[in-house]
Structure formats: structure tokens, C-alpha cells
Amino acid sequence: MRVPVATKSHHYEVLLGHRFLTEAIQTYADQLNKADKFFVFTDAHVWEAQGDYFKANFPYDFEVFILPGGEACKTFEQYYAAQTFLLEQKCSRKSFVFAFGGGAVGDLTGFVAATYMRGIPFIQIPTTILAHDSAVGGKTAINHPLGKNMIGAFYQPEGVIYDTVFSETLPVREIRSGTAELIKHAMISDSAWLEELMAADSVMHFNQQELAMQLKKGIEVKAKIVAEDETEQSVRKFLNLGHTYGHAIEAAAGYGKVAHGEAVMIGLVYCLLLSERYGELNRPFTKAFLQFAVKNGYPFEAVNDYTFEQLTSYLMKDKKTEYGILQFVLLEKIGKPFVRAIDLKECKEVDAEYRELLAEVLV
């Protein structure tokens, strides 16, 4: 399966398949045959689990750079080490870099590619469900202790290869985390799709064909939005549904303690509560959605681990904040997102409602 992504700066495709890595890479033969060197950035966990398959199916010689797993790779230190590695290996503007791993590896690799010699080509080979989202659209970044993804660039890959073979060995928590972004895509685009997900016995056990179709839907939603707004000036903000409150939880906990998708799910419920005040959504739906999330194993304990005051400083660092006012992505109804300025007083009121709802549902 192919999903085209057409932005103002670059056109490319997302290739989806199962056990097709060699075939997919050969799609880029015209570009790759002109390259002088190949570099693969990955993390220790991915390389141990999937390195043999990758080496057996990657048709070129390459040098590998091993990163720590998860958000630990998105630091100044790892960014600097990656640049040093490329310089020492005599990487040139004719070289190609491959991001082989989850969303964090893709974010770091993309930012390295965007800034090394002012830009070298790279291809995303995501290995997690979560990365179906982050690998598409050209957002690259590293973290700062004061905020997630605060240092980065918009830089599109030459392509994205999603081989569902990698999902076969994902831990349950990683599947759950990635599926949260799929659910988010359904919420901003298609009420029937969300109803289908909420009616499923579980969103944790798709077979390979079902997973590929779900990923294709999610990628199509993102591709359409990114084509209209590459640098997040307008509709691309809709993709941040659940991320304002979710990022605050994630940052307060310390990156990696609460999985990104877990934090997004926490944020999605918060946005539903806030949306009740400005659209057609109501408390019974919000409660049903929370129960659906709990049934699928999403943890919400982190909400009660921090006071609203502890979350405030992280909320105010959200990249959508304008002139000191928080901008939340809300839903008029499922499939119809919008952005609204919300003051801290109202945020605190909704935070209190959230804690009350959790006390009711998590009994």
C-alpha cells in the first residue's frame, strides 16, 4: 500500500507492507545508487530485536549508530554525538541516513539530518505503531529539560517505509501507546471510525491486515492535513488534540516515565471534558470514552500524581501558546476540531472535573 504525502517543500510516499523491506528500499534505487555512504540510526533495543532482519534485507553496506532507547535519545548530548559520528565517518551531502526505530529515534535522526551540513537526505523506517504518526509530516526535534520537542525543525524525509513485521515483537505497552495516536486521528476526522474502534473488543490485538488498514487510515488523515499546512500555522494544530495537557503530564513525570501515547490518551479525555463546554459533546460520551480507554488498559494514575499547580508551568510551555494564552485543540463534535484560547482558571476547573470523573470510573 502507498500513501502519498505532498507538502510545499517535498513530495514523497509512505510505503506499507509486510516483510517487504528489501522491495521497499529498492523503490528508492535511483536516489540510493547515487549516494556515497549509508548510515543507519537505531536504538539498542530495536537493534537487538530486529537487527538481524534489517541486515538480511538491507541491500547496501552501511555504518550503524546505536542510540539509547526512548526519549533518552532526544538530548543535546546524543544530538552532538550523532553529529560527531557523521563527521568522523566522513558523511557528505551525498550520503543517506536511515532512521530505524520508534518515534524518538525518528525525531532525533530527522533533526540530525536537517542540520548536518544544512541538510542531508534521510528515510524513515519506523518500528512502532506510534511512529506511524511521528514519521510522517517532517517534524523533527530533541527535548530540553524545560519542554518536550522544543528544539527542532520541519524537515521532510525522502520517504517512509512501514514494515508491519516489526509490530509482531512490540511490547503491549508500546502497542497501546501507538494506538492512542490512531484513536486521536479518528477523533479529528471520522465519527464512524471512532465508533468502530470503541465498539471493538480490544484495540490491542489487530492482525497484520487490520493493523495495516488502521495505519493507512491514520497516515491518510495526517497526510491530508500536512499537505494543507506543513509548518503548523493553521489546521496542522488539529493533530495536537490531547497533546497540551498530555505533554504537561509527560514532562512532569520525566520523559519516558509515562509513555507518550499514554499521556496523549490522558490528554484526549481532558479535551473531551473541555469540549463539552463549547460544542455538541456531552458527559455521557466523555465517560464512555474514558471507560473504553480503561478497558483497553490505558493508565490514568498520573493525573492524580500531580496537582494542577504542578502542571501549570508545563502547560504554559506548550508551543501553541500565544501571548501567554493557552490554545487548546477541541472538538465541536467528533470529526470537527477547532482551536480555542482557554485561560488557566478554566483549565483548573476542568482539571478538577477530570479528577472527579476518574474517581467515579476507576472504582
UniProtKB/Swiss-Prot annotation:
Binding residues for Zn(2+): 181, 243, 260
Catalytic activity: 7-phospho-2-dehydro-3-deoxy-D-arabino-heptonate = 3-dehydroquinate + phosphate
SUPFAM superfamilies for the chain: Dehydroquinate synthase-like
CDD domains (alphabetical): DHQS (cd08195)
GO cellular component, one term: cytoplasm
Residues annotated as transmembrane: none
One GO term (biological process): amino acid biosynthetic process
Broad class of enzyme this protein falls into: lyase
Subcellular compartments: Cytoplasm
The entry's keywords: Amino-acid biosynthesis, Aromatic amino acid biosynthesis, Cobalt, Cytoplasm, Lyase, Metal-binding, NAD, Nucleotide-binding, Zinc
Cofactor binding comment, as recorded: Binds 1 divalent metal cation per subunit. Can use either Co(2+) or Zn(2+).
Gene Ontology MF terms: 3-dehydroquinate synthase activity; metal ion binding; nucleotide binding
Chief subcellular location: cytoplasm
Pathway linked to the protein: Metabolic intermediate biosynthesis; chorismate biosynthesis; chorismate from D-erythrose 4-phosphate and phosphoenolpyruvate: step 2/7
Residues holding NAD(+): 103-107, 127-128, 139, 148, 166-169
InterPro entries reported in the protein's UniProt record: Dehydroquinate_synthase, DHQ_synth_AroB, DHQ_synth_fam, DHQS/DOIS_N, DHQS_C
Known EC number: 4.2.3.4
Required cofactor names: Co(2+); Zn(2+); NAD(+)
Task of the protein: Catalyzes the conversion of 3-deoxy-D-arabino-heptulosonate 7-phosphate (DAHP) to dehydroquinate (DHQ).
Xref: NCBIfam families: aroB
PANTHER family, alphabetized: 3-DEHYDROQUINATE SYNTHASE, 3-DEHYDROQUINATE SYNTHASE, CHLOROPLASTIC
UniProt family annotation: Belongs to the sugar phosphate cyclases superfamily. Dehydroquinate synthase family.
Protein name: 3-dehydroquinate synthase
Source organism: Lysinibacillus sphaericus (strain C3-41)
Encoding gene (name): aroB
